[in-house]
Amino acid sequence: MRDGNTVANIIMGVLERELQLPTGSLTSLHRTTARSSDFLRVLRYPKFVPGKSLNRPGFPPHRDAVSVAILFTWLGGLQIPMPNAEMIDKDTETEESWRWVKPLPGHAIVNLGDALQILSNNVLKSGKHRVVKAPGPQAGFDRYSVLLGTRPANDTPMTALKSPRIPAYTPEQAKAKLVDAQQWGANSVRKVLSVMEKK
């Protein structure tokens, strides 16, 4: 966890500079000594079984309720929508609009999550993705991945930080109820579970 947090904070340090935030604006919210909902998970997606659809998502399209997600995996299965994705409706891409994220030996896949999108008032974008059965012969193997997710300290107000690069809230945004990171994380997980139950 400590090493993963160090990597995430290096990324957030770069983002602080690019967003013209004072040093520590993001990194101070992600200390290993603070109570938070950071997590380290081992994920297993079973191998392809004949008779089941190869393209049936192992995890439906979603964005992560984290600041930074760091994924270690050695089989395919992760997909992201193309930038010019053809949409069925405002939230649903066509099957042809998804592309594979190829895992590379000795590399991790890094994804920004919803927390950074909130803290930057949509300047940073949370990456939408899904998990499907691995392509080709890889589908014959169980897919194991290690996922590290960092979240702001539990008492962090989930509101945009102040910076010349971050737009001020609109009057409508300013009316929204302010929650801390702990409550926001719990609400986000409940939403994902609700979507999963409907699938």
Where are these regions (language model features)?
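Basic, alpha-helical interaction scaffolds
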Residues: 1-2
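C-terminal flanking tails of non-heme Fe-dependent oxygenases
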Residues: 5-199
